[in-house]
Amino acid sequence: MDFSVIIPARYASSRLPAKLLKDVHGKPLIQLTYENAINSGANRVIIATDDKRIETVANDFGALTCMTDEHHTSGTSRIAQVLEVLDIDNDEIIVNVQGDEPMLNPSVIDQVANNLATSSMQIATLCEQITNKEQYLDPNCVKVVFNKAGKALYFSRAAIPFFREAKDFDLKLCFKHVGIYAYRAWFIKQYLTMSKSSYEQVEKLEQLTVLNEGFDIHVAPACDGIGHGVDIQCDLDKVRKELN
């Protein structure tokens, strides 16, 4: 199975400025993400950035880079520009790996690519079991509900599924979305033609527009650890501690 990994790597970050260049035991954060991706089964890994500083650092550790516009509003639109610049075939499988996921296991990247390749759905993504009630109630933790065929029914920042009777509360039914996606190049291009749904506008979740347009998203529990993503300083501290 052939697939490419594209890592959107935006320089600006309001909560942790220049986070992708933060040092983690002698390496910039983006390099850790890249190394995990290069150790997957991907044919190639491309870092899509909007900043010369990231491009220079990435080139120094041997990465293939593609400069993109600084005004993209999502990683998906940044990836679409890469597809155009590099003239990537419409049927190629693309895995979108966020640049701030330095502990993402390579096997998880392979899993989501394979799930798309063996499914009739247009997107594949992953989830993890929610382990405590605080996480279940946290609006920063995106929840997903899916059917027995792995088809996403809804994504929400709200606590879903809702347990009408307190005695029925069961974390085994609760899953958080993991923000890694696989899709074919043609679908990324088509996504950019979609108008944002009302659900995306209120929840700030772009995958809701995909569901609203009638496309299917395959969801499966991740086969291995996802680790800490880095949004704020305490996340970076956790990564440094775990990798020490």
From Swiss-Prot:
Pfam families, A to Z: CTP_transf_3 (PF02348)
Localization annotation: Cytoplasm
SUPFAM superfamilies tied to this protein: Nucleotide-diphospho-sugar transferases
UniProt keyword Nucleotidyltransferase present: yes
Pathway(s) of this molecule: Nucleotide-sugar biosynthesis; CMP-3-deoxy-D-manno-octulosonate biosynthesis; CMP-3-deoxy-D-manno-octulosonate from 3-deoxy-D-manno-octulosonate and CTP: step 1/1; Bacterial outer membrane biogenesis; lipopolysaccharide biosynthesis
Keywords, sorted A to Z: Cytoplasm, Lipopolysaccharide biosynthesis, Nucleotidyltransferase, Transferase
Catalysis: reaction(s): 3-deoxy-alpha-D-manno-oct-2-ulosonate + CTP = CMP-3-deoxy-beta-D-manno-octulosonate + diphosphate
Entries under InterPro entries matching the protein: Cytidylyl_trans (IPR003329), KdsB (IPR004528), Nucleotide-diphossugar_trans (IPR029044)
Xref: CDD domains: CMP-KDO-Synthetase (cd02517)
EC category: transferase
Annotated GO CC locations: cytosol
Known EC number: 2.7.7.38
GO molecular function: 3-deoxy-manno-octulosonate cytidylyltransferase activity
An annotated GO BP: CMP-keto-3-deoxy-D-manno-octulosonic acid biosynthetic process
PANTHER family from the UniProt entry: 3-DEOXY-MANNO-OCTULOSONATE CYTIDYLYLTRANSFERASE (PTHR42866), 3-DEOXY-MANNO-OCTULOSONATE CYTIDYLYLTRANSFERASE, MITOCHONDRIAL (PTHR42866:SF2)
Family assignment from sequence similarity: Belongs to the KdsB family.
Annotated function: Activates KDO (a required 8-carbon sugar) for incorporation into bacterial lipopolysaccharide in Gram-negative bacteria.
Protein name as catalogued: 3-deoxy-manno-octulosonate cytidylyltransferase
Record organism: Ruthia magnifica subsp. Calyptogena magnifica
Gene that this sequence comes from: kdsB
